[in-house]
Amino acid sequence: MALPRNLLTDNPELYEARFPDPDRLAGRWTEDCLRRYGAGPRVLDMGCGTGRDAAHLAGVGRTVTGADVSEAMLAHARVHHPGPVYVHADLHGFDVGVFDAVVCLDSALLYCHTNAQLDAFLTSCRRALSPGGLLVAEMRNGAYFLGRTDLLDTPTVSSFTWRGTVHRSTTTLTVDRTAQLLRRTRVWTSNDGSAPVEQRSAWRLLFPLELRRLLTSHGFEVLELHDGPGPRTEPPWREGRLPAGTTDADRLHVVARLNSPV
């Protein structure tokens, strides 16, 4: 799968400036999940991006492979977040070794837009996991958009400064009900005289019961499925906070164990 041109994924340092995580919240949340369910040391971070979370997991003693489809992200990760082994791989089908856990954070799983792509991802996870291995994923919650339009009504404007240049983004979200996708149009402008850049992307909208059934059909036992707390929730997760019993808010978190063969 070739990535479309994208200002942030093509410029990993810019990505980290736009989405700072100085406390490694996502990595710590993931390690908490892995530790709580006794995962072994071998971890695959699928869709690892700049490598921050993979490096955190390596730093606490795990043997980590970070995988991504973006060569720019992988090159950045190898230099700036050493520790893991970084490899090129596609969510829609991969075979990069055997692990005790597969991690897929920040809605990366939702770039599987079709049922066939979701099946291919979970088939690859099943192949990659040792018996009893864990899948830990964090993503947008499709159920949030049932009857809610607050994230759709008004474009979201944000800005940040990187190396003296102010970058401003205007993001519009729309729901494609037929394809069950959340489509995003983002227009970037900056004060350095560059022409505006328009980018389009999409996430699959998965609903909690749909995700549970999908995982079960691929041989996983769902251990947790909830809307928080997590690294992207408000308030965010912190050590000692246990999962909620609801799946109503805008993020969805899942921990599933691959059933051992009978």
Report the location of each language-model feature:
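Class I SAM-dependent methyltransferase SAM/SAH-binding core
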Residues: 51-93
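A short acidic, Gly/Pro-enriched loop at the edge of an enzyme's catalytic core
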Residues: 92-101
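C-terminal lobe and adjacent flexible extensions of AdoMet/dcAdoMet transferase-like proteins
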Residues: 205-262
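SAM-dependent methyltransferase
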Residues: 136-213
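A short SAM/SAH-binding and catalytic strip from SAM-dependent methyltransferases
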Residues: 100-116
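A short glycine-rich, Lys/Arg-flanked "PGG" loop and its adjoining helix->strand segment in the class I
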Residues: 119-131
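Conserved class I S-adenosyl-L-methionine
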Residues: 1-49
